[in-house]
């Protein structure tokens, strides 16, 4: 297997949509990914589009600030609004990469699934990453299928892959949805992210 990375185009800003179930570690993953890309000479902006959890934006801002990463947020209940205005803001302020942190949602919640579909349409992402906790069980495979149906994501980001977990179900997800694992979270720390090398 070859390692699958994000293939950046000249598009400004390059948009990465991050989605997943509740509790999969999306917000932390967005900051880790931003930090990773910043070290790769990109200029990322995170859009705070997780409006379901009251503390989500605060958590995102605290984590991002420590890494000196910019966050765009708004006083609104509409993530679509955040996304369209955030991309506009990125354009005006020469950010070359936008990372959208979306609310964790259950695949059986049709309202929220339709919402992420709409976020996808509005943001026209160049890359859609599905975040999966490596400790998940079999039901996660069904969830991944559903997300893929709605979003047709381009890659998987495995979180909490430290210590003993070999990411059994998560690896099954890869073959079931036929999408590459692009990044793995290797520790709780903000530099705990790596491009996935299938042969390791």
Regions found by a protein language model. Give the residues of each.
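Nucleotide-state-sensitive switch-loop elements of NTP-binding domains
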Residues: 1-19, 24, 28-131, 135-143, ...
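Phosphate-centric recognition/catalysis
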Residues: 159
């Amino acid at each position: 297997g070859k390692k699958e990375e994000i293939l950046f185009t000249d598009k400004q800003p390059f948009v990465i949509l991050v989605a997943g179930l509740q509790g999969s570690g999306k917000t932390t993953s967005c900051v880790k990914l931003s930090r990773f890309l910043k070290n790769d000479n990109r200029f990322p902006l995170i859009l705070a589009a997780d409006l379901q959890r009251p503390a989500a934006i605060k958590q995102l801002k605290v984590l991002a600030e420590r890494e000196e990463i910019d966050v765009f947020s708004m006083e609104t209940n509409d993530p679509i609004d955040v996304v369209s205005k955030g991309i506009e803001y990125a354009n005006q302020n020469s950010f070359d990469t936008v990372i959208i942190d979306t609310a964790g949602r259950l695949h059986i919640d049709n309202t929220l699934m339709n919402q992420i579909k709409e976020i996808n349409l509005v943001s026209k992402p160049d890359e859609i990453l599905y975040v999966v906790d490596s400790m998940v069980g079999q039901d996660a495979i069904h969830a991944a299928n559903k997300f893929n149906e709605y979003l047709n994501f381009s890659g998987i980001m495995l979180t909490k892959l430290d210590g003993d977990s070999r990411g059994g179900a998560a690896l099954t997800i890869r073959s079931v949805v036929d999408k590459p694992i692009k990044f793995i979270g290797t520790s709780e720390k903000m530099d705990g992210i790596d491009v996935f090398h299938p042969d390791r």
